[in-house]
A protein has these predicted regions:
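ATP/NTP-dependent adenylation/nucleotidyl-transfer catalytic domains that generate, transfer
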Residues: 4-150
Length: 150
């Protein structure tokens, strides 16, 4: 279900350029500059954090509207019906919250720069979150969903 914007590559009229652009689009994002094993990338970010489309969805509704984990979970169930099952959505939502809080210290020490867009995790924009924030409450709500208590 990942959206792939290949319009320019498909319409530029230059085969060599088109081939390079399509190759870039087809290359998975990797967090490390590890050499490929047998010609294949050995580490892919999506394998570690889950589908980007789910994380983008979670991030948007957390930052733009401040929705609770339970509400985001319900919205994701509807939005991704037929693409992801309940367990997959919940698994990656828990991963999202765990990583979102654990990585906050990295965002707090960013250099000055402009805010771009309506949703941002940068402290120079709208996010005012302490570096030592704890994810316990959010993860507890997700555990309640997992147990069927919510």
């Amino acid at each position: 279900m990942c959206i792939r914007d290949s319009y320019y590559a498909d319409t530029c009229g230059e085969k060599e350029l088109s081939d390079v652009l399509l190759d870039v689009l087809d290359t998975p994002v990797s967090p490390e500059l590890l050499p490929p094993e047998d010609g294949k990338i050995s580490q892919k970010t999506e394998d570690l954090v889950g589908p980007y489309e789910l994380h983008d969805f979670y991030l948007y509704y957390v930052l733009r509207f401040g929705y609770s984990p339970a509400k985001i979970f319900r919205l994701a169930l509807q939005a991704f019906e037929g693409s992801y099952d309940r367990e997959t959505i919940l698994k990656w939502l828990k991963t999202f919250y765990r990583r979102f809080f654990a990585q906050q210290f990295k965002r707090s020490c960013l250099p000055d720069g402009p805010k771009v867009g309506s949703v941002a995790v940068s402290p120079r924009g709208d996010l005012r979150m302490p570096s030592d924030a704890c994810s316990r409450l959010w993860l507890k709500e997700l555990e309640m969903i997992e147990k069927g208590e919510r």
